[in-house]
Amino acid sequence: CFMRKSATEKGIDVPETYAVAMIFTKDLKDIDVFTEYCEINDLKVVFVRTVPVDISALGQQALDNLPQIIQVFVVPNTLMSSKRFDAMIYLTRKECEHKLINDKDFYIPSFSSKVISYKGLIMPTHIKTFYVDLRDEDFKISFSLFHQRFSTNTLPLWRLAQPFRAIAHNGEINSVEANRFNVEVKSEQLKSEIFSESEMKRLLPILQPIGSDSTSLDNMFEFLLANGVDFFKAARSLIPAPWQNAPHMDSNLRAFYEYTATAMEAWDGPAAVSLTDGRHIGCLIDRNGLRPSKYVITKDDKLYITSEYGT
């Protein structure tokens, strides 16, 4: 694949099991902090790569705020971290975020063994121009989660460009202040089958204190996935269907919604949200139903899910 080829060209042999962190930063000392937390969590940095870009694709505001874009290749360093690789990836990223919370230019768009995020303050027609990697014939993907709009309720920033790590979001989360408060209140009582009690404390806070409503929803969805919650259950726990007004709903599905409603408050829009865990990809509209989402299956068996037919 392209990622392993880019390492091989530099004389680095990357094993089958590896992850790539995509990092925005203006201070390369941040990479040292990232490496330190990798080592704490039994992960090993094997290759650091500056992502090649073509700045002619950028407008002036994007160019003025352009971070350095770095890819860090990470592998498990012990048998235990190999068995808990995805958990250690998540824990490492959260600890880096906590440590560098005051560094407004530091952001990790993705750190995963399954997904990599190429995003920025770029017009959609220019993304392949800006990211030279995307033009390589060996760069293959099984799906793409793509978002054309920039943040509308917050100042456009590289780190706030969508998609986020697990979602792309059209609309607003109007319940976000209540959602954030409820997550903070309940987080101290949470138990996990994936993380130890001490690791859970190191993960907190679940939601980054800076960021948009989409950032908070992304943080919460990602937290559920990292703790072993099924992709579909996690999605519908946060963004439930209007089950109270669906008298013919399957009784088991209704029971699921009744149960989750006692434990978790809905993240209400109006919103249309696309989600992925690296294996599945899906799209939901919230129970208000005020943001469109349409799908088209083409003659060559491609599935497109968009907010508008003309997208």
What are these regions (language model features)?
Residues 1-311:
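Conserved short alpha-helical segments that host acidic/polar catalytic motifs at enzyme active sites
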